[in-house]
């Protein structure tokens, strides 16, 4: 199954309904730097920006919690939306507790999305209200929780895709 979502669509007489992205895909093919090494069986961190978010796609899994994944954008950009696709294991319902931050210099970060109280499972559609420009984005994963019993579920960890949409400056 694919995990694409489009907030807007347009109708074209010849082609029918056309999905409209919330800006340019700013993260496609970018390098990802993890705070900790991948776990055994994990794909390389760059898999989260390869454009592939299918259940059969490679995913990043850390060997340490909490962990961070930092992405350097090709140029400073205004971020309009972030899509985060997380792994689901045989119907397990796990919620990620996370933040997403932005920075111009890679040193001082501003929180763009606070998902530490999130109970969303699987695919996250995250509008970004902050209109500042950012060169770096960082996903901080604090916990992965089984939503049925509130127990840690790091065994189900896996980030398929992190896609930031927006407008380069």
Task: Please identify what each model-predicted range represents.
Residues 1-21, 52-111, 120-169:
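Aromatic, loop-rich ligand-recognition surfaces of beta-strand-rich domains
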Residues 115-117:
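Short beta-strand segments within Ig-like beta-sandwich modules, predominantly Fibronectin type-III
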Residues 14-50:
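Predominantly extracellular/luminal regions of secreted and cell-surface proteins
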């Amino acid at each position: 199954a694919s995990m694409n979502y489009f907030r807007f669509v347009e109708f074209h007489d010849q082609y029918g309904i056309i999905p409209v992205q919330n800006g340019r895909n700013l993260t496609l093919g970018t390098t990802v730097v993890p705070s900790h090494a991948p776990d055994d069986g994990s794909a390389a961190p760059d898999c989260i920006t390869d454009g592939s978010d299918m259940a059969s796609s490679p995913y990043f899994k850390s060997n340490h919690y909490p962990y961070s994944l930092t992405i350097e954008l090709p140029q400073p950009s205004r971020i309009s939306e972030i899509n985060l696709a997380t792994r689901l294991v045989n119907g397990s319902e796990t919620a990620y507790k996370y933040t997403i931050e932005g920075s111009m210099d890679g040193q001082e970060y501003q929180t763009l999305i606070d998902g530490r109280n999130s109970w969303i499972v699987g695919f996250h559609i995250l509008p970004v209200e902050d209109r500042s420009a950012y060169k770096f984005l960082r996903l901080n994963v604090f916990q992965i929780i089984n939503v049925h019993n509130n127990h840690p579920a790091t065994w189900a960890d896996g980030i398929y895709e992190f896609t930031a949409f927006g407008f380069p400056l």
